[in-house]
């Protein structure tokens, strides 16, 4: 329901509400009693048509009964209808642009009287854009070495390596030994031993404890070994740090790691649309150069934003910072869930401390966004429908929905403008980065 409110005279004032927050404003509004009465009568009539009241037929309940029985509900409807309308009208008259939801205080609503309320809200600050044209950041040359390419090829071969059994000799460094073992904590005889029925260790490997390499070197299938491992206090696995463990190990088999040859058969398995080793190296170089360029550009833009924020200091609306904190917190919790953290464990976290820990980064992000929006205005940067469509198509692929479904959802929850602003800011940052060399 809407109410036309351009004719009645409205009394309003605007003032700074709290000196501590220079962006906090308040408006005090008085809506004439005849407007309030008309709105009340409208809701009384609507309730009278639908309300079911004992002793009365539906649609035949007297207005006086409706006013008494549904007084609170009707008042809530009046507030919900009139306050947003008159709030927008008054802030418009005062040339104020709220960026936060108004907090209504001092509400006065009684039959036959004007509706009076005070609403506090934040506005955007004056945003300076000093010196953005002159910011310079390093654009390092992108170089991919032959050694990096060979390391990538070796990694691809490693992923497709096979293991051949060794039956004609004892284990030596570089071999893989299939073992089972039992480990006992020597400082706690009552502790239950740790039993591992099958595991493969690489003799001399970077992830293999030295004592395992020394004691398994020279063994064959069927051999058994007993030895101690003393773990340092700073050992990575806290369950073992500082402990002395006795291991009883049974050797099951020995294996040699076989890497595939860099031939057409191996290359075809990669599905990289290349056929020869030289073509593969060229493909790897292209991908590595793209990745390095992207990484360097990301770092450069980050430094550019830091410089931009440092050059232009201004107060930031707390409401916008708090919203950004929630976005960062939600993103972090989603990442923890993907890593396997249980909901019960998340609930035990100190969210107050987490939110405060995000405040500095959130403030920087809000400042950067406001600065980029202001610069976009100055540079007349716009977002085309095609650019928005591409972004929506990308979101659709990620969420496995159709672009139409994603657009409808974004429109419904009010996120479409946010997406457009995000694209515009990215274009602005691209422009600044291109000028910063």
Swiss-Prot record:
EC number: 5.2.1.8
PPIase FKBP-type domain residues: 174-260
Superkingdom: Bacteria
GO biological process assignments: 'de novo' cotranslational protein folding; cell division; chaperone-mediated protein folding; protein transport; protein unfolding
Matches recorded under InterPro entries: PPIase_dom_sf, PPIase_FKBP_dom, Trig_fac, Trigger_fac_C, Trigger_fac_C_sf, Trigger_fac_ribosome-bd_bac, Trigger_fac_ribosome-bd_sf, Trigger_fact/SurA_dom_sf
NCBIfam families assigned: tig
Protein purpose: Involved in protein export. Acts as a chaperone by maintaining the newly synthesized protein in an open conformation. Functions as a peptidyl-prolyl cis-trans isomerase.
Protein name (record): Trigger factor
UniProt source species: Koribacter versatilis (strain Ellin345)
Encoding gene, per UniProt annotation: tig
């Amino acid at each position: 329901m809407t109410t036309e409110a351009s004719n009645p005279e409205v009394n309003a004032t605007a003032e700074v509400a709290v000196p501590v927050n220079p962006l906090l404003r308040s408006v005090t509004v008085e809506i004439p009693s005849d407007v309030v009465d008309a709105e009340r009568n409208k809701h009384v009539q609507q309730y009278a048509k639908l309300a079911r009241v004992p002793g009365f037929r539906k649609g035949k309940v007297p207005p006086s009964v409706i006013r008494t029985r549904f007084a609170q509900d009707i008042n809530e409807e009046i507030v919900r209808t009139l306050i947003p309308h008159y709030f927008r009208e008054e802030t418009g008259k005062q040339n104020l642009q709220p960026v936060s939801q108004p907090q209504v205080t001092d509400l006065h609503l009684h039959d036959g009287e004007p509706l009076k309320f005070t609403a506090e809200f934040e506005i955007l600050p004056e945003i300076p854009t000093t010196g953005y044209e002159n910011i310079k950041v390093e654009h390092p040359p992108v170089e991919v070495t032959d050694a990096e390419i060979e390391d990538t090829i070796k990694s691809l071969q490693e992923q497709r390596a096979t293991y051949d059994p060794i039956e004609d000799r004892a284990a030596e460094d570089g071999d893989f030994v299939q073992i089972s073992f039992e480990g006992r904590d020597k400082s706690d005889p009552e502790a239950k031993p740790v039993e591992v029925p099958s595991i493969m260790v690489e003799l001399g490997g970077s992830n293999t404890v030295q004592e395992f390499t020394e004691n398994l070197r020279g063994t064959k299938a069927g051999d058994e070994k007993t030895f101690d491992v003393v773990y340092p206090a700073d050992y990575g696995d806290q369950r073992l740090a500082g402990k002395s463990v006795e291991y009883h190990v049974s050797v099951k088999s020995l294996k040699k790691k076989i890497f595939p040859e860099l031939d057409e058969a191996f290359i075809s398995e990669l599905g990289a649309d290349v056929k020869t080793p030289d073509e593969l190296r060229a493909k790897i170089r292209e991908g590595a150069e793209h990745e390095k360029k992207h990484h360097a550009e990301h770092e450069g833009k980050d430094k550019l934003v830091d410089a931009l924020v440092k050059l232009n200091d201004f107060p930031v609306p707390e409401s916008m910072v708090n919203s950004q904190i929630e976005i960062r917190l939600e993103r972090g919790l989603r990442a923890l869930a993907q890593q396997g953290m249980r909901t019960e464990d998340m609930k035990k976290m100190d969210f107050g401390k987490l939110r405060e820990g995000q405040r500095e980064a959130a403030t920087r992000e809000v400042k950067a966004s406001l600065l980029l929006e202001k610069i976009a205005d100055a540079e007349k940067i716009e977002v085309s429908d095609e650019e928005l469509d591409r972004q929506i198509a990308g979101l659709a692929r990620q969420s496995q929905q159709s672009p139409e479904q994603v657009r409808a959802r974004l429109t419904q929850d009010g996120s479409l403008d946010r997406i457009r602003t995000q694209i515009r800011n990215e274009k602005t940052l691209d422009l600044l980065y291109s000028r910063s060399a």
